[in-house]
Amino acid sequence: MAKYTEEQLLELKSEAHTPKPEILDAFNKLIEEVKESIEQHQQHQRKWHNGDTYIDEHGHERSYHHINRRRQSKGASGVPRPNLRKKSEPVVDEDGWATLSKPKKGSFAEGDAIEERIKFRETNNSGAGIKARPNNKNLGSSKAVDPREIASDKQTKAFNAFAALGDEDDDDEDDE
């Protein structure tokens, strides 16, 4: 492919023939957009890389912007944490199809626990039910409340301010 300088291209522009000017206009528009994006990138570089750098312990030039950021978790420092979950294992059937089976979780119904479960159900179905005692220390008292006790908590005699003013003579006698 031949290489031309800008001057040679400008000289050949008058002789050039473009069959579809829309394509040339779209190409020129694309070139302008690329120039704008390059200029924006350079402005961003000037803003963030304005000489505020230092040489770290490994000899790399670094900016100061990373210093105030939060640190990554310990697992993200390059050493992956072990995955403790059980991975699903592919099971291949006789047709050659491989399916992933999820690992079974331990449940109450596994193994010998089935017998215990049946015994527990039989004792509950007998109709007696399970007797549970509430923890009265944390709950209110379970004793029945007598309505007379509730009435005794009420204030039986209302305070009368006028009667108290009239009794000033009685209080003076007590003070002497």
Curated annotation (Swiss-Prot):
Keywords: Cytoplasm, Initiation factor, Phosphoprotein, Protein biosynthesis, Protein synthesis inhibitor, Translation regulation. Residues 55-64, 145-155 have a biased composition (Basic and acidic residues). One of its GO terms (molecular function) is translation initiation factor activity. It is found in: Cytoplasm. Its main location: cytoplasm. The keyword Transport does not apply. Residues 37-155 are annotated as: Disordered. Disulfide bonds: none annotated. It holds the Pfam family CAF20. The keyword Phosphoprotein applies. One of its GO terms (biological process) is negative regulation of translation. InterPro entries: Caf20 (IPR031456). GO terms for cellular component: cytoplasm. Belongs to the CAF20 family. Acts as an inhibitor of cap-dependent translation. Competes with eIF4G1 and EAP1 for binding to eIF4E and interferes with the formation of the eIF4F complex, inhibiting translation and stabilizing mRNA. This is Cap-associated protein CAF20. It comes from Candida albicans (strain SC5314 / ATCC MYA-2876) (Yeast). The lineage of its organism: Eukaryota, Fungi, Dikarya, Ascomycota, Saccharomycotina. The gene is CAF20.
